């Protein structure tokens, strides 16, 4: 009986946590640069100059600064 009660309590706690609680542990970095023709460039500059030491990747044309 105690085991069933503990299992029910565990399920209730996990249900209260919900799926969104995992998102709190994932940090989303702002995208301050973008990949244009394979070159990482800053979004805010008018001339879109290249960023020194930027880490670009081609997944949905996103990139982020190191």
UniProtKB/Swiss-Prot annotation:
Is Magnesium there in the keyword field?
Answer: no
**Signal peptide extent:** 1-24
- Localized where? Secreted
What GO cellular-component annotations does this UniProt entry give? extracellular region
Q: Which Pfam families match?
A: Defensin_3
Disulphide bond pairs = 33-63, 40-56, 48-64
Lineage: superkingdom: Eukaryota
Which tissues does the record link to its expression? Answer: Produced by the crural gland and detected in venom from the spur located on each male hind leg. Is also widely expressed in both male and female tissues, including intestine, kidney, spleen and testis.
Q: Name one GO molecular function term.
A: toxin activity
What the entry lists under InterPro entries is as follows: Defensin_3, Myo_ane_neurotoxin_sf
Q: Which UniProt keywords apply?
A: Disulfide bond, Secreted, Signal, Toxin
Describe the task this protein carries out.
Does not show antimicrobial, myotoxic, hemolytic and cell-promoting activities.
Please report the name of this protein according to its UniProt entry: Defensin-like peptide 1
Species this protein is from: Ornithorhynchus anatinus
């Amino acid at each position: 009986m105690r085991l069933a009660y503990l299992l029910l309590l565990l399920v209730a706690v996990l249900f209260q946590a919900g799926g969104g609680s995992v998102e709190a542990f994932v940090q989303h970095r702002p995208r301050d640069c973008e990949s244009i023709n394979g070159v990482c460039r800053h979004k805010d500059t008018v001339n879109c100059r290249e960023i020194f030491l930027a880490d670009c990747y081609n997944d949905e044309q996103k990139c982020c600064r190191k």
